[in-house]
């Protein structure tokens, strides 16, 4: 008699309609944030830092490549 309510509760917890756990929500938020950071503006800034500060390439800093 007690097994049926326990089984139903476990079934509800394992169902896809159950709310997401905290870790899953954080992981999806971080994934969404990473996707939003890869805009052309942000990638252009990374290219500028790499070319002008990291490599010190005059050709790159002079704007010969499209940033």
Swiss-Prot record:
Residues that make up the propeptide removed upon maturation: 20-46
Extent of the signal sequence: 1-19
PTM description: Contains 2 disulfide bonds that can be either 'C1-C3, C2-C4' or 'C1-C4, C2-C3', since these disulfide connectivities have been observed for conotoxins with cysteine framework V (for examples, see AC P0DQQ7 and AC P81755).
Compartments, record wording: Secreted
GO CC annotations on file: extracellular region
Organism of this sequence: Conus litteratus (Lettered cone)
Protein name: Conotoxin Lt5.9
Primary subcellular site in the record, as a coarse category: secreted
InterPro entries: T-conotoxin (IPR031565)
Family: Belongs to the conotoxin T superfamily.
Highest taxon listed in the record's lineage: Eukaryota
Tissues with expression: Expressed by the venom duct.
A GO term for molecular function: toxin activity
A Pfam entry, by short name: Chi-conotoxin
Domain writeup: The cysteine framework is V (CC-CC).
Entry keyword set: Cleavage on pair of basic residues, Disulfide bond, Secreted, Signal, Toxin
